[in-house]
Amino acid sequence: MVKKNIRADEISSIIRQQIEQYNDEVTVVNVGTVFQVGDGIARIYGLDNVMAGELLEFADGTVGLALNLETKNVGAVLMGDGLTVQEGTAVRGTGKVAQIPVGEAFLGRIVNALAEPIDGKGEIQTTETRLIESNAPGIISRRSVHEPLQTGLVAVDAMIPIGRGQRELIIGDRQTGKTAIATDTILNQKGKDVICVYVAIGQKASSIAQVVNTLTERGALDYTIIVAATADSPATLQYLAPYTGAALAEYFMYTGRHTLVIYDDLSKQAQAYRQMSLLLRRPPGREAYPGDVFYLHSRLLERAAKLSDQLGSGSMTALPIVETQEGDVSAYIPTNVISITDGQIFLSADIFNSGLRPAVNVGISVSRVGSAAQLPIMKQVAGTLKLELAQFAELEGFSQFSSDLDQASQNQLARGQRLREILKQSQASPLSVPDQVASIYAGTNGFLQKLAVNQVRDFLVGLREFLDKRKPEYLEAVNSEKKLTPKVKDILNSAISEFLDEFLAS
């Protein structure tokens, strides 16, 4: 072995070089130990410097969320099945709260509650991230709701109008068509530059697949993001899914775009949160829900807004869905969400079973801010429709107990029956504004009185085709003027009369 001689001047330069390369950074890792685990909950000892809502990393790779910060331990909920987490497992605090990637690349994709793709189409390439939980826009950041968001449903657009930036609750028993209204609204946004986010919470995978198929067939998936937390997902993911959907929509809202978010449904989220809270031994309140279940939904729905011009005029419209039991809207979660939202569309099982679909109960459905956003032409043509239908429903109930009605009442009943036919619509067939206006105008101006009740729907379908093919000036007039001008009235009067003669003659 050759011994190398180092000169004295080299020694000093080597020492200087080593000193320059010395890194004095000390990495402090916050580590604890699991002492109890089960039912998706882990209790951890030794995690002293942890934030509420901080992400925790377990030794086996499982991720958890710190929710209970107690004097001697931390209660965390697991985001996986947690089967490999056991007593003594090391846990590391990440120092970060839950955040997800966001961006244009999410359009047309199906993701889970952590925004990870689950549609088998590969990774989603994006550079930006957003916190899952972020503050709602303040008062100064907002503008009042003034632009319409058309659902394509006559019953909603005419009588319970929705504006961009509004929160409108869809409430009703199971199997009354709540999801159908939401998906029809997504279909109707085609070509209107509205980004849609559909959040499925605690639903069967087959139900979500059905929605995906409907949107794909109609070409609506291109402008839609689906966030799915299925019924077999851990309660933590069902709890987080709506906030993930809101964060994805917020990205577009703050870039000046218009978005629509559907939460289907918040009853399941509340149940998942109740499960987590009870397992964390938080004190139960009414219906065993924790005391902050109102805040659970209010902080989510307050994120929907119409932004001011200074912030780019973007908007986020929320359509939360809540399921009732036997039509009981006075239960805890329904009353909470009704008080947070700007109105509700109430779907009735009785109306649904009677054959009127969408099964909207016009009498107790309301839109508190939507009238300011309703198109002038719709306001003019449908102004008295809600009142007329409410009076008709009352008279119809009364007529069941009385056989001899005067002529005026019989006329009102006949008119009401025909007006009700206007509201009937097949699923996944939203109507444009000109088509809706023509249908309502024909009904409110007495043109349908010459028809039998069972002929009304066929007549209206034919009328829409007639206007489309033979009266192109009608479409131009409605789209350009947006008001029921004498010109639009003249076109409608002549077209409806002309088609009515043809229809009756055939």
UniProtKB/Swiss-Prot annotation:
InterPro entries: ATP_synth_asu-like_sf, ATP_synth_asu_C, ATP_synth_asu_C_sf, ATP_synth_F1_a_nt-bd_dom, ATP_synth_F1_asu, ATPase_a/bsu_AS, ATPase_F1/V1/A1_a/bsu_N, ATPase_F1/V1/A1_a/bsu_N_sf. Keywords: ATP synthesis, ATP-binding, CF(1), Chloroplast, Hydrogen ion transport, Ion transport, Membrane, Nucleotide-binding, Plastid, Thylakoid, Translocase, Transport. ATP binds at G172, D173, R174, Q175, T176, G177, K178, T179. Its EC number is 7.1.2.2. One of its GO terms (cellular component) is chloroplast thylakoid membrane. It catalyses: ATP + H2O + 4 H(+)(in) = ADP + phosphate + 5 H(+)(out). It holds the Pfam family ATP-synt_ab_N. PROSITE patterns: ATPASE_ALPHA_BETA. The record marks S365 as: Required for activity. It is found in: Plastid, Chloroplast thylakoid membrane. Its main location: plastid. It is a peripheral membrane protein. Belongs to the ATPase alpha/beta chains family. Produces ATP from ADP in the presence of a proton gradient across the membrane. The alpha chain is a regulatory subunit. NCBIfam families: atpA, PRK13343.1. This is ATP synthase subunit alpha, chloroplastic. It comes from Pleurastrum terricola. The lineage of its organism: Eukaryota, Viridiplantae, Chlorophyta, core chlorophytes, Chlorophyceae.
